[in-house]
Amino acid sequence: MTNTKYYPEVSSNADFAAIEREILKLWQDNNIFQKSIDNRIKDAEFIFYDGPPFANGLPHYGHLLTGFIKDVYARYQTIKGKKVERRFGWDCHGLPAEMQSEQELGISGRLAITNFSIEKFNSHCRASVMKYTGEWEQYVTRQARWVDFKNSYKTMDTHFMESVLWAFKELYNKGLLYESMRVMPYSWACETPLSHFETRLDNSYRERADKAVTVSFMLRDKLPHSEYKEYRIFAWTTTPWTLPANLALAVGSDIDYALVPKNDICYIIAAASVSKYAKELELKGDEQFTIIKGSELEGLRYKPLFNYFENHPNSFKIFACDFVVEGDGTGVVHMAPGFGEDDQILCESKGIELVCPVDNSGKFTKEIPDLEGLQVFDANDKIIIKLKEQGNWLKTEQYIHNYPHCWRTDTPLIYKAVPSWYVKVTNFKDRIVELNQQINWIPSHVKDNVFGKWLENARDWSISRNRFWGTPLPVWKSDDPKYPRIDVYGSIEELEKDFGVKVTDLHRPFIDELTRANPDDPTGKSTMRRIEDVFDCWFESGSMPYSQAHYPFENKKWFEDHFPADFIVEYVAQTRGWFYTLMVLSTALFDRPPFLNCICHGVILDTTGQKLSKRLNNYADPLELFDKYGSDALRITMLSSNVVKGQELLIDKDGKMVFDTLRLFIKPIWNAYHFFTMYANADSLKGKSDFASENVLDIYILSKLKIAVQKIEKSLDNFDTQAAYHQVSEFFEVLNNWYIRRSRARFWKSEKDADKQNAYNTLYSCLETMAIAMSALVPMISEAIYLGLHNTVIPQLDYGISGDKPGAQDPIIKSQDGIRGCRNDNLSVHLCNYPKLSNFEVNHELVATMDTVLDICSNSLFIRSNENVRVRQPLASITIISKHNDKLKDFEDLIKDEINVKAIIYRDDLENYATTKLSLNFPMLGKRLPYKMKEIIAASKKGEWEATASALAICGETLKSEEYKLVLEPYSHIKGAASFADNSSLLILDLELTPELIKEGIARDIVRFIQQARKDADCSITDRILIEIISESDLSKIINIYGDYIKEQTLSEFAKDFTPDYVNEIELENHKIQLKIKR
């Protein structure tokens, strides 16, 4: 008679990567992703915005991390009944694309691009930005992330760009845009200004050594009431290259300045800085100087260092202001309004127009003939030499400071006056701060700290770039200043109406060719021409919510229903990037926050804390890890770590962390599934989802199941994958190491009675329910388990040679409410509804008692380990000292069997066995009560404290729960003791071994030896075997005494004179023992 097998014969050492590949194929062949969306009603949607990546490079670990998080919540909300569209997007414009194209074309700089042809350059950019889309799809698909690539949006699409134009015009009409020549962070390598927030991206500030120089300026005016032949004032700067453009000096009104005489010259320097220049000024240290306030220097004229701008109006005067800091440098700041924000503000207020003798590539112009064509940083030495020759130099020093670098080229930025269009963020930043309070940030401190403080200090946003590949600013100006006019366009229709041509491409140079006569010029000679600038690509990504829908030109209702997003996620630096630009534009255009929940994850570094990079070769290719361990393992490694809480994750190159996840998280899940299929197939029994068993272990594990399912749901509702993974792991720990182990006899027995069926049903219910509950967290392994439980053949899984394969013709057993409930037909776990288990009530009293039983067992193991007593060695007794022993007596036999003792002694006089000690959290208490620590420590040692259920009083202070811990400490004369985690109980194992106990322990070791030999001999779990045990006389006596026990536990019979299939030999208690097996 053939043995009917209803489940796959899965291996305990499964190739999870191979299983995942089969799952991916099954999903694709059956269009499961689309089914998961179509199954859900449109009225219940979960709105998710997918931040667009650049496709001109391969995905890295950071992309995968973000993708895993996105996928978890999209899958989870789907099984919660929501419709979750996952439209992918591509960021196409901006510096990344331009820099790559310049490199590939072998050209560099604006002039070279113009000579090459803007049209050809942009055409190359268009192709390059989609270079790696195939690889992106491969990575994203392999990581089991479901996204809609077919309907992806691209920021270079005409419809997307048109919505960006609309947003610009809306801001213009609201009076929230202006054009100005202002000092901005400037990338001379990219020949473009950057926004202030771009200088904070990707740790763009880094340590840099610069030459700081102190120079003297000769005053043209003398100080009143002071007679010296000559007056000089010292200024200190870390940017010597800005000195040729100096137009003013700034001092602090209330700062004290010393008049330091030397050889008929009076030197002026902040009094607090005199000692720093004692050597240069040849001071002894005991001199007394005349002190004046900075306000007394106001308006004094000085002679310029160089003659380049000596006739510049209103210049070369000393001004008092409030931004000069005492102790910095000399207390005197040189002002070059073309290269400093404060400089520009001060000089403008004094009627000094800025000068900017540096071109777009960071080189001096002909206005500085001595330095023309020289890069500014390369000019420092020449400037210092000239200052020495002129007698203006006092000191040069190396100055190490954090300095902003270009986030694309890694070159040091300069600050330079450039014309740009700005969003008046300062006009409505208070409203942004208000709307930020409506957002749930994860981690929570981002709301008011990282992001909140950034918003409070927000500046106006420069949104124009003098580049080529981007959405052009829709601004046309008259080319004749006699007849000024500005036209701003917000749609293609408006452009076509005014210019009378069909517009099919909004990119340069095509858009630049649109010209028309200036309507405000009666001569008809001037022309309206578009300004050359394109948008900052961050403006485009910040426009993603409406631009992806081509709002407001179409899909108006769709956008209104899909704004704001329920959820977005990126790494924490996007608080200065995408999150910020979304917030600015959403507030300005719609007066609403753009998203309601936002996860800011941390960064992934190597084990030494360095960034992952090809140059350092410090990370493994993710595809290699996927092929070796599977992507579920990498998903769990990342999302169960603190990186989801905004912290760093250090990952090794060799994949050990991922392997450990496979071993410690996935294998226990698979082991439970393997156990079920192995024994169910051996018994030709099917499990079903059934919660009606009255067996106490079944009730307990089903109660733990419902609790775990509820906690996973709560964790994911709170956007906490770390907690959710912990719940999954904790449940399978109990399922494997308690329920299955304590129920083995029910699965092993030959009778196919109701108790055995209940055991199978209970284990089936746990596996099926958890497969659904954890499907977003472990999507492919959950799928394999679910499909296996529902008789779906996965080709990679071997069903064996003998017996029948799972019968697809068998009727599907319908589970109780809440497990399935949408159109599924068992095609996929991802088409199910999240389990509610509403027809099953948790037995909380049983759970509490059984959890105590588990604590007793685990503490007993702890004692055995500490005392070096093996688990198979029986002990005489355990003493349980507790106030709550009554409930344990129902489980006395279970406890004795589990911890291998002959008797349990119950006591309640805890005070005779242990004392409660107070353990303080010194780091935390030290921060809160630094001046009381000595007193508190002394009182804790004397026992001068009082504890209640929720607090502890000591030295007049009430300690918080996290600031202390109460520890139950056994008296020193008591051996073999351990306390419960809650300090409510104490256990004491009797460690004295009698000869009888030792013999029984040896018998148990022999059983273990035979069971291992069965595995090594490839015996199936149902095979009965013949064994012969050859040993020395002492062991033979023990074997004779415990023979029946040995045979029962190992499904064996003793025999002699047979030809063995397997032979092995070990040493036991210093005696050799040989085992022969015949199947």
Curated annotation (Swiss-Prot):
Motif extent ('HIGH' region): 53-63
EC number: 6.1.1.5
Pfam families xrefs: Anticodon_1, DUF5915, tRNA-synt_1
InterPro entries listed in its UniProt record: aa-tRNA-synth_I_CS, aa-tRNA-synth_Ia, Anticodon_Ile_ABEc, Ile-tRNA-ligase, Ile-tRNA-ligase_type2, M/V/L/I-tRNA-synth_anticd-bd, Rossmann-like_a/b/a_fold, tRNAsynth_Ia_anticodon-bd
Swiss-Prot/TrEMBL keywords: Aminoacyl-tRNA synthetase, ATP-binding, Cytoplasm, Ligase, Metal-binding, Nucleotide-binding, Protein biosynthesis, Zinc
Cofactor: Zn(2+)
Keyword Protein biosynthesis: yes
Motif, 'KMSKS' region: chain positions: 611-615
Location in the cell: Cytoplasm
Catalytic activity reported: tRNA(Ile) + L-isoleucine + ATP = L-isoleucyl-tRNA(Ile) + AMP + diphosphate
GO annotation, biological process: isoleucyl-tRNA aminoacylation
Binding-site residues for ATP, renumbered to this chain: K614
Domain remark from Swiss-Prot or TrEMBL: IleRS has two distinct active sites: one for aminoacylation and one for editing. The misactivated valine is translocated from the active site to the editing site, which sterically excludes the correctly activated isoleucine. The single editing site contains two valyl binding pockets, one specific for each substrate (Val-AMP or Val-tRNA(Ile)).
Quaternary data: Monomer.
Family of this protein: Belongs to the class-I aminoacyl-tRNA synthetase family. IleS type 2 subfamily.
The protein's role, per its UniProt record: Catalyzes the attachment of isoleucine to tRNA(Ile). As IleRS can inadvertently accommodate and process structurally similar amino acids such as valine, to avoid such errors it has two additional distinct tRNA(Ile)-dependent editing activities. One activity is designated as 'pretransfer' editing and involves the hydrolysis of activated Val-AMP. The other activity is designated 'posttransfer' editing and involves deacylation of mischarged Val-tRNA(Ile).
Protein name: Isoleucine--tRNA ligase
Organism: Rickettsia canadensis (strain McKiel)
Lineage: Bacteria, Pseudomonadati, Pseudomonadota, Alphaproteobacteria, Rickettsiales
